[in-house]
Amino acid sequence: ELRYLQLQIRPHFYLNAITTISSLIYQDRKQDARSFIDFLSDYLRYLFSGSDTQVTLQQETKHCKSFIQLQQIKYPDTIFYMFELASGTENIRIPKFLLQTVVENIFKHGFSPEQFLSIFLESALEEQNGVRGLRMTVEDNGCGFPPEMLASFPVKEDNGHVGLSNLYHTLQLIYGPAASLHISNAEPNGARVTIFLPEEENHAHPSRG
């Protein structure tokens, strides 16, 4: 049975969120605390919303924004993001948590509170190898991918980026070989993840939500 990125309860995430709220209140940053709770509510509502395995690109990017905004409150003046969705891509359905996995990977491996982080996400309708579909690119200015991962990806290794390897293999199961997930390093620094999903009628293995 095909199972797509089953939601796992991560106690440390919730404990960190509670600690952050407590810290904001202690620092008398009451408005930030209220905003944090609002973004956290949006984030959790998405996580626990029904059993759908697919959502629109617009829904997924809104969820990613909630996560980034939580980090912006926690680390003020250190994070910038820009999302640009091409016209006609907003309502295309994609696997739920697809982009969340990529964005969370940035904060797990490419973010240091001492350095300013920029995140860019864009979408476009393109054709690859004669197949039309949706291309999504997520880029940051963090530390980038280690050379050994660039050389071995998508083979699963103990490099801390197992989530991206799992994502690649999951997309192959859902869409077949027409789907792709490529990783590279941006210039002058940072990581880039490019995902291509074929149009619905081209799915080799359509996902049923």
Model-derived features with residue positions:
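Generic C-terminal helix-cap and adjacent flexible tail
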Residues: E199-G209
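Two-component histidine phosphotransfer core
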Residues: E1-S184, P188-F196
